[in-house]
Amino acid sequence: MFRPEEMVKLEVITLNRYKDTLLTYLHEAGAVEVREVKVELAQKDTPNEYHRKAASYSISMSRLVEFLGTYRKAAGGGIKEFFFPKEKPKRTYRYERLEKLIKDVEEFLGKVEPEIKAIEGRMNSLSTEIERIKEQIGILDILTPLNIDVSYLRHCGVVEVTVGLVDRTRVKELADALKKETENHVAIITKEASDKALVVIVNLARDHDKVNTLLAKFSVEKLEIPEGEGTPKELMKEYSKKLAEKEKELEEAKKEASKLAEKYYDDVLFYKELVDNERDKSTVLPMLARTNMTFALTGWVPRPDVQKILEGIKRITEGKAYINVREPRKEELEEMPVKLKNPGWARPFEMLTEMYGVPRHDEIDPTPIIAFTYSFFFGFMLTDFLYGLIVGIVAALLVKGHKKFNDGTYKFAYILLWSAFFTMLLGALFGSYFGNAADIMLQYITGDQNAHAWRLLDPLREPMPMLLAALAIGLAHLFLGYTLGFVIKWKNGDRKGAVFEQLPWMIIIIGVALLASQREGLDAAAKAILGTGIALFAVGELVINGGLAALMIISDFFGFVGNWLSYARLMALALATGGIAMVINVLVGMVWAIKFLYIGPIIGLIIFFGGQLFSTAINALGAFVHALRLHYVEFFGTFYSGEGKRFEPFKSKREVSKLELEV
């Protein structure tokens, strides 16, 4: 706790014949972050033809999964599935070598891909044909006002017929231009067609170029005349029959696709996951060094996993390997990855730390601290017992349903569960139950207009004590941050930074706290401490910034004041939550007074529950964001950089498959 997991450097040299099996073992173990071997005398390894095939088959099967997934019957879903998702069953694959896996994949694809591609091609062809028929029906609908055999509208010999749509306002201008260019050797028919005019132009074939130039100039949208004979209405009936037939064929094809999805979807997904992991596994090959007989790899391993990894390497290589495990050198510390290490109760809060950035090797891990302070700030800003209860119930259900997955949803819900506890606690202390709803109920039941729920403090009626409490919390939070910064810098040998950058603010905060306490006998001591802190701060600015000291004194001082005052948002959001809830209650009271056919109470209940649920969601979102901001900007700015490199192990991703490695 407070310190990341210890890391050691692993170096391995072994025979090439163990490469595939060893990489597969490390990939499944997921405990080593592989790094590039920096050796000038050896060659870099490269993916072979089987790795390239794995990448190719991954793309092919992604398309098959996408197609089959579209026509697969949805399993589960809904609210229950959201809260309590089921684990996907995993099939075991006995891994011997990459060549054998590729052979199995090719055998599987040779069986299922032709079936799937055939039905996919048939469906694509039918869909294209249906769209073509719909387009032709649309054209026939436009031609309906002409009421002539559409065969007359096609080109025939020396006469050329063009049918199209043009802007109504340009019809006369177009007709005049055509007559002029063709020396009146043209016939023009116009009909109204929705927002444009339908024009039929009959001209001599020799005038083709002249006519087409004018059609382009006047933006005439040409229509392709559908095949067949008869009036547009007669042909529309024929095409509608064709459309119905093709749509029926498409539905039959979709049913066949659904059957194929039920039959093959899980298998395709299984083999896709196998080749996906092989493709990902091949990405480390360029990091390895090799000779004709051997290869070398290096990487970082968390100390607790070292023994397991060493035993696995020795077993796979039959002891024919050079293995070196050593402490990181001084020049390697900056590139050493960081894996957070926290007790179970704080582990989900690592998500908040990682969103900002993991600590450097010489920093502390703030996760255990923010596990408490973040939840407390969230609760302080939401500050309503029943809002906290709603958030807590939802979070508890998600925690129960997602715990086995340990996924992002579980971690987020766990954080909300702790935050809901503090929301309920502080809501009870401030007497807020859907705002003043509890007070209204008590007054209605007892008939006493002064009755109210027990509370330690009413934020809406006594905002100043609430503001002072928020600022006091902020001062304590900043003091903790500066203290941690002092300890870190002192321990890392930066004594000047500890004394001149961290210590002055610690002393100033103590002085401010003593002055604010207004206790008799402490006034002189408080002023002396505050003066000492300010003097040390000024000296520190001179030592660190030299000629810019005067400017930096103003900047840093007002920066500190700004950070401190930022904690006033604790009070502001608490008041906003109570205020919104109270407004909803006032609206409900106004509507409730309508007694006609019980409309008032019915609408009032809808407004009450709908409004309070909306208020819970919007205020919880605000509390979540602002609690993060107080940590990321104000708190972390005092001691934490988050510039470490996150530990990213060479690890497989498996949801539906499980590998059994044959050694």
From Swiss-Prot:
One of its GO terms (cellular component) is vacuolar proton-transporting V-type ATPase complex. The chain crosses the membrane at residues 376-396, 412-432, 468-488, 497-517, 534-554, 568-588, 589-609. It is a multi-pass membrane protein. It is found in: Cell membrane. GO terms for biological process: vacuolar acidification. The keyword Ligase does not apply. Keywords: Cell membrane, Hydrogen ion transport, Ion transport, Membrane, Transmembrane, Transmembrane helix, Transport. The keyword Cell wall biogenesis/degradation does not apply. Its main location: membrane. GO terms for molecular function: ATPase binding; proton-transporting ATPase activity, rotational mechanism. InterPro entries: V-ATPase_116kDa_su. It comes from the Archaea. Component of the A-type ATP synthase that produces ATP from ADP in the presence of a proton gradient across the membrane. Belongs to the V-ATPase 116 kDa subunit family. Has multiple subunits with at least A(3), B(3), C, D, E, F, H, I and proteolipid K(x). This is A-type ATP synthase subunit I. The gene is atpI.
